[in-house]
């Protein structure tokens, strides 16, 4: 039988939790991998007053805290400035729960509202329109059914399928590799020349389009920038 002695540490006294701060909203901002995001702008707006708001930026741990007045209700937003393909974008960040987008009152307490960077999906507090690509975190593409340079417009009833394949080395707005091919469809209708596809994770893609009408499938030739110029079977683009 072997015996050994060791020093036993006395149990430490638990640190009391920090008391709630009255009329405060706080939380943490993370990216799609759950990592904290520093330097994100967080803004609380009071819709009951004229230009009543307060703004802060997140610290290195992705945390923020805003002291609010107890008057009325508040809505809170977060934005991230991103450099992508030599352009600057101010992107609204999402929230963990749909109910977090609603206005809230502090009622003398601390309210927690966390944010997460979403590359696609519905924005719960915005009207959504499939016809105009609005109300989503992802980007949208606008197509016009044209008659130009000897190419007739597609006939009503044509099912149009758009395939977006990330080019080599493409990345999404958050810097993660773009690996998912996107396929979306719409149908040509009589009297309508304009069509949208939406909620696409923004990246650099190669686009190809096919049309199917009466069981016959054809390649759709495309131009860009709404100009009737050269047409191509595919295009590399970003948005």
Feature roles, as predicted:
Residues 1-4:
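Sec-dependent bacterial lipoprotein signal peptides
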Residues 6-24, 28, 35-239:
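Long luminal/extracellular ectodomains of secretory-pathway precursor proteins
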